[in-house]
A protein has these predicted regions:
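Short, hydrophobic/aromatic beta-strand segments
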Residues: 2-4, 121-122
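An amphipathic, aromatic/His-enriched active-site/gating alpha helix that lines ligand/cofactor pockets
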Residues: 3-22, 28-33, 40-84, 128-141, ...
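Short low-complexity stretches enriched in small and charged residues
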Residues: 35-39, 63-67, 111-117, 123
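Catalytic micro-motifs at enzyme active sites that drive phosphoryl/nucleotidyl and oxygen chemistry
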Residues: 24-26, 95-96
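Surface-exposed interaction/gating patches
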Residues: 86-164
């Protein structure tokens, strides 16, 4: 984990910045152990992306990274990536830092929507889900459309175990599955609204 934060790009101006590295160890859903890295290309848009991709050229890579790349390769066993674009309302890395958004638990949603509707769905997330989940201690740290297809979105939330437990318990109670807490019908209504996409 520590090696990732030593990536030389972290110290170079106008290059991507690591927004977060999340480690799925167990009981989180999906295959584990697994690492999810979120890189922020910065304010230069596609020009910034091009600079970052260009430095990965095989001839330049060794000179740029030195031994860092070889050491990192010891732990890498495969994986996949998704090039994502921040939707309107998604905070930048600088905004996350400025607002002091932190979490002890990060909830990642990789969702499939009808082709052609990702931005409409994400606008609804910003309008409805962000304030609702905010009442349960969840702060959106990434609201992204997947740029390689027309049917996937990624939403990342910073929260705590207590925040996630409270949200899930209120949802279950609203569905009649539990009487531990008071149910929140708005959570079920949000799920029904989001399912329309």
């Amino acid at each position: 984990m520590e090696h990732l934060w030593k990536d030389p790009v972290e110290r170079m101006p106008e290059m991507q910045r690591l927004q977060g590295s999340f480690y799925v160890c167990a009981q989180g859903g999906g295959r584990w152990p697994q690492v999810i890295n979120i890189w922020d290309i910065g304010s230069k848009g596609w020009e910034g992306w091009a600079k970052n991709v260009d430095r990965l050229n095989l001839k330049r890579r060794k000179a740029f990274y030195g031994d860092w790349w070889d050491t990192a390769a010891q732990w890498r066993t495969g994986g996949f990536d998704r090039l994502c674009g921040a939707a309107p309302g998604s905070p930048s890395t600088a905004e996350i830092a400025h607002q002091g958004i932190t979490g002890t638990l990060f909830v990642h949603q990789l969702l499939t929507v009808r082709p052609g509707t990702p931005l409409d769905y994400l606008a609804t997330v910003v309008e409805q889900q962000v304030p609702l989940w905010g009442e349960y201690g969840h702060r959106a740290t990434g609201i992204y459309e997947v740029l390689g297809n027309q049917h996937e979105v990624v939403v990342v939330w910073a929260t705590s175990i207590a925040g996630q437990t409270g949200l899930r318990a209120a949802r279950d109670a609203a569905r009649g599955l539990s009487d531990e807490v008071e149910g929140d019908d708005r959570l079920v209504a949000w799920e029904q609204r989001s399912a329309a996409f």
